[in-house]
């Protein structure tokens, strides 16, 4: 039993051991499978990482190649642009060379043509003189008497003389002194003509034609063949008389023709055996330099005498030929050949401009680049500074040309006479301003500061050069004018601060310092009209009409400077009431002392007002000016007040 028992236990134990072994194998296999699976997963992950790394490397390589390609494209484009610029420069250089050659060829042809024409003029003058010398000795006295009478009739008709010529019958009965008397009358007539017409007046076409007829008649008389011996009653007259008369007549006609520029001045005068009558015109001033010119050492251009060296082109410095006079260009910078002027820049002296800007009033041409290259521009007349000239810089950065500088009003004390004259001007228009308030000149910064404190907000593109104040504020005014120092620098200017108080509706009028008297006066007239309106309680007017009436007053004041006469002040009040378009004379105009530039500047200021295209000042002036033209200043003012 015991053995059986033990036997059965052994079998059970063996089965257990077998089961345990089977379970261990299964677990071992499971673990093995898991390990294999994990290994395979690791391998897959490694492959994926390797593939990702490879893809990243490929992407980096592609990016690098793309960057290299972009760099190559940029380099190629840069080279293409440089090549294009090089080709453009070569084309421009070729074009410039071609233009230079073309210009030189044109100048050569012009010079050749001018030389030929000058030679023809000289040949014509010499031929005429030789003809006069050879033929004036071949005329008979009786036939010359007839011609003299015809000449006297034509000259008297030309000069509107009241005396009548000596008749043929009377002429024959006069002693040997008679022919000389007739010639003296003719010489006096020609001399009077030279005096009256040789001082800056252009001859009328009708007068030129008559003088040409006169020359033809003289030439006809000189070309006559020699006639039979003289009449018996004239045998006692010297054979020298007709010759002297012919030479006098020929010389008078030649001088007349020279005065019209039809023949050139010749150094060789017609020579005669006897004494010739002198027909020298009175001393005159050169139209260019204003110095005296001597008879025989000048050229007569449209009735004005010039030194030969003064009537030259400002661009090429060559004389302007007589046949080019009608086509030459003249402006404030000088005179020019028309061909030179079309290509000449007055700023940099460039003589071959391809494109140009042109000032609408001064008609001065300049290269467009000078508008933006820092070339100074006068704050008054708007002209650019030519090279080799020095504009003056004011303390606030504005530029002033030397012509405007000559009449500039520089400090507050200096402008007071103009202030008093302006009050007289307004009183003459029946618009007397009773209240007193200061008139101060200030720098640009002080004017801008006052404008802000006055709370003036201009919504238009305008340059403020004056302001009529209504509020109390502290103003820095120019108390001591600067003086011109070395190199046209302004030194010594002083300013002082003062408080303007409100004693009436106007506390002060401020205007930029350093402007010419004419421009300062126009601005003052404009601001004084604002003051007149405020002092009379006229506020909140239509802005366009208010600025328009102020511009009209400025324009009227400029008119008074242009047309003022010495006796106009006496009837200023009656003129204002009867005709508003005839302003009273301003006592400080001093028109007789004006320079040519001042006369041009007043026209420039008027032109600026008339051509202003701004929506308030320009439109306002044209609207109100038409109203004043159709009625009167006082009626226009009433209409403006009704339209507030």
From Swiss-Prot:
Keywords: LIM domain, Metal-binding, Repeat, Zinc. Residues 119-138, 181-200, 244-263 form the UIM domain. Residues 572-591 are annotated as: Disordered. The keyword Hydrolase does not apply. Residues 284-355 form the LIM zinc-binding domain. InterPro entries: DA1-like (IPR045218), DA1-like_dom (IPR022087), UIM_dom (IPR003903), Znf_LIM (IPR001781). Disulfide bonds: none annotated. One of its GO terms (molecular function) is metal ion binding. The keyword Repeat applies. Residues 572-589 have a biased composition (Low complexity). It comes from the Eukaryota. CDD domains: LIM_DA1. The UIM domains bind molecules modified by monoubiquitin or ubiquitin chains and promote coupled monoubiquitination. Interacts with ubiquitin. This is Protein DA1-related 6. It comes from Arabidopsis thaliana.
């Amino acid at each position: 039993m015991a053995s059986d028992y033990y036997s059965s236990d052994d079998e059970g134990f063996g089965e257990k051991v077998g089961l345990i072994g089977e379970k261990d194998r299964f677990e071992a296999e499971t673990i093995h499978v898991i390990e294999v699976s994990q290994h395979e997963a690791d391998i897959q992950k490694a492959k994926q990482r390797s593939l990702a790394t490879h893809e990243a490397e490929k992407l980096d390589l592609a990016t690098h190649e793309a960057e290299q390609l972009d760099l190559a494209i940029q380099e190629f484009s840069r080279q293409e642009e440089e090549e294009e610029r090089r080709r453009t420069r070569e084309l421009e250089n070729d074009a410039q060379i071609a233009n230079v050659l073309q210009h030189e060829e044109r100048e050569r042809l012009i010079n050749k043509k001018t030389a030929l024409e000058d030679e023809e003029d000289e040949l014509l003058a010499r031929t005429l003189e030789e003809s006069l010398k050879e033929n004036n000795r071949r005329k008979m006295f009786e036939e010359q008497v007839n011609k003299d009478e015809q000449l006297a009739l034509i000259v008297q008709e030309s000069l509107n003389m009241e005396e009548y010529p000596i008749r043929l019958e009377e002429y024959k009965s006069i002693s040997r002194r008679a022919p000389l008397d007739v010639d003296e009358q003719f010489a006096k007539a020609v001399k009077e003509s030279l005096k009256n017409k040789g001082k800056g007046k252009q001859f009328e076409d009708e007068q030129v034609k008559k003088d040409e007829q006169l020359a033809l008649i003289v030439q006809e008389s000189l070309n006559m063949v020699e006639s039979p011996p003289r009449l018996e009653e004239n045998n006692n007259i010297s054979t020298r008389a007709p010759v002297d008369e012919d030479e006098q007549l020929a010389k008078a006609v030649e001088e007349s023709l020279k005065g019209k520029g039809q023949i050139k001045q010749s150094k060789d005068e017609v020579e005669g055996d006897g004494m010739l009558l002198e027909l020298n015109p009175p001393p005159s001033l050169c139209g260019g330099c204003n110095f005296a010119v001597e008879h025989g050492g000048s050229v007569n251009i449209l009735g004005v005498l010039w030194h030969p060296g003064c009537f030259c082109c400002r661009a090429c410095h060559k004389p302007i030929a007589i046949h080019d006079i009608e086509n030459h260009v003249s402006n404030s910078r000088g005179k020019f050949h028309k061909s030179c002027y079309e290509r000449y820049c007055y700023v940099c002296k460039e003589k071959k401009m391809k494109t140009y800007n042109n000032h609408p009033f001064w008609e001065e041409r300049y290269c467009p680049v000078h508008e933006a290259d820092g070339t100074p521009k006068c704050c008054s007349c708007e002209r650019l500074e030519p090279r080799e000239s020095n504009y003056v810089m004011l303390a606030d950065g504005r530029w002033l040309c030397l012509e405007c500088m000559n009449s500039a009003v520089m400090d507050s004390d200096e402008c007071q006479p103009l202030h008093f004259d302006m009050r007289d001007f307004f009183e003459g228009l029946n618009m007397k301003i009773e209240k007193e308030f200061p008139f101060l000149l200030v720098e640009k910064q002080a004017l801008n500061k006052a404008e802000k404190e006055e709370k003036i907000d201009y919504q238009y593109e305008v340059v403020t050069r004056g302001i009529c104040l209504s509020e109390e504020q502290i103003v820095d005014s120019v108390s001591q004018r600067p003086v011109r120092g070395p190199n046209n620098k302004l030194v010594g200017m002083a300013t002082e601060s003062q408080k303007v108080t409100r004693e009436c509706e106007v506390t002060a009028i401020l205007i930029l310092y350093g402007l010419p008297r004419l421009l300062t006066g126009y601005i003052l007239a404009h601001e004084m009209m604002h003051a007149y309106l405020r002092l009379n309680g006229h506020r909140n007017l239509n802005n366009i009409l208010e600025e328009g009436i102020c511009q009209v007053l400025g324009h009227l004041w400029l008119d008074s400077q242009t047309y003022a006469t010495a006796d106009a002040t006496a009837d200023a009040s009656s003129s204002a009431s009867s005709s508003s378009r005839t302003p009273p004379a301003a006592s400080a105009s001093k028109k007789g002392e004006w320079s040519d530039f001042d006369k041009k500047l007043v026209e420039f200021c008027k032109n600026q007002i008339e051509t202003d295209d701004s929506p308030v000042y320009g439109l306002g002036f044209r609207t109100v000016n038409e109203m004043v033209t159709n009625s009167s200043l006082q009626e226009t003012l009433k209409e403006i007040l009704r339209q507030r």
